[in-house]
Amino acid sequence: MDDAEILVDVQVVPQYAAVVDATLVERAVAQTLRTDDVAGPVEISILITDDADVHRLNQTYRGVDAPTDVLSFAEDDDHSFVRPPDAPRYLGDIAISWDRVVAQAAEYGHSRERELAFLVVHGVLHLLGYDHERGPVDEADMRAREEAILGALGLSREG
């Protein structure tokens, strides 16, 4: 898929705008879609925010009263909203907590860039139907895909 066929709407809350690399987010999305041979054009929205916002979203949409690192909301095909025939296929929304990016990068001993890219890749894979919570085989498949995509981006665990 050509990068021109990938529309990524990256929104970063103001307090993190100076530290979040939106280009890295776009690259991680594109690499994930190319690796999985997704046909374009497609569109994804990504919000980079704080623990409080992600906590609220987690509570509202999943019934979980806790913050988390990444949430994915795949576009359902109920067709309640009619899109023009030439519009990109909307894959869904991802919300990422920058607070978790910082904490987990420190905990795992790698860069914030790698952690951010990991969470983007993880979220996009969920939008594509992958689910590590289905069992050990699915978890191993998803982890292998994540590592391959991060490797293609040049983001090792040590980076």
UniProtKB/Swiss-Prot annotation:
GO terms for cellular component: cytoplasm. One of its GO terms (molecular function) is metalloendopeptidase activity. It is an enzyme of class 3 (hydrolase). Binds 1 zinc ion. HAMAP family: Endoribonucl_YbeY. Belongs to the endoribonuclease YbeY family. This is Endoribonuclease YbeY. It comes from Roseiflexus castenholzii (strain DSM 13941 / HLO8).
